[in-house]
Structure formats: C-alpha cells, structure tokens
C-alpha cells in the first residue's frame, strides 16, 4: 500500500477532523453517512465488523452495555496524501485513554481504518513528566 493523492492532503485532513468532531466527539451517529461511501469501509480493529454498519453496530453495542467511548480532545492530526493519523485523548469505559487512529481516504470518503487504544496510567506512576501527548 502506498501513499497517493498528495495534492489532497489538506482536504483529507479536514475530512477526518470533521468526522472526529461530528461523530466521535459530537456523538452524532446520524452524520456517519456523510463521511463514507455507502457501507464500504475496511476495518482493521478485530472487534468491529467491516462496513459503516459494523462501526455503528459496535458503537451501539458499547452504549447498550453502558460502556462509553469518549473523544475529549484531538491533540494532532497528521496527514500525507490519502493517509490521516489522529492522536486523541478521552475515556473508554471511564478510564483515561489515548486513541491513535489511522484512516485511508479514497475519493473524498473514509475507506479504511486502523487503531490502537491505550489506557493512560495514573500520573503518579510515570517515569517522566513528558505526558502521553
């Protein structure tokens, strides 16, 4: 897989930023279709099925179980061509969490996603004062 669409870097960065603000931070699942090409969406998180329907089902299942996934702050959004990486902070199930999300954009829509989530340790256990972000 290669980086393409270098001329669309800023456009793709804005698409992902808007998705984060509208859907992940704003919790507006009704806006999800604005960011995808129908149900076409490749998901690399093994706990979520492919397709926008898989994403919505996973988010809905978490909510039904009383598990919240909150994106409080987007610290940085790095982009090159059709790839956009967002580094965010929030909570998962009430625990402070860092989110690293990588998206591939195709034809102005989010097409593919990889992610890593990590619980942020209590500051009293840190071996330095650099912080997670």
Residue positions per predicted region:
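C-terminal and inter-domain tail/linker signature
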Residues: 1-133
């Amino acid at each position: 897989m290669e980086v393409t669409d270098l001329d669309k870097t800023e456009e793709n960065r804005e698409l992902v930023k808007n998705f984060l603000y509208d859907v992940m931070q704003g919790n507006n699942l009704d806006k999800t279709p604005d960011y995808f090409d129908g149900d076409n969406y490749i998901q690399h998180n093994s706990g979520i099925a492919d397709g926008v329907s898989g994403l919505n089902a996973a988010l809905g299942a978490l909510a039904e179980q009383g598990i919240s996934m909150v994106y409080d702050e987007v610290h940085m959004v790095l982009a090159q061509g059709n790839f956009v990486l967002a580094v965010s902070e929030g909570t998962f199930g009430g625990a402070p969490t860092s989110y690293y999300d990588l998206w591939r954009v195709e034809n102005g829509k989010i097409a593919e996603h990889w992610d890593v989530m990590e619980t942020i340790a209590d500051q009293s256990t840190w071996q330095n004062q650099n912080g997670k972000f």
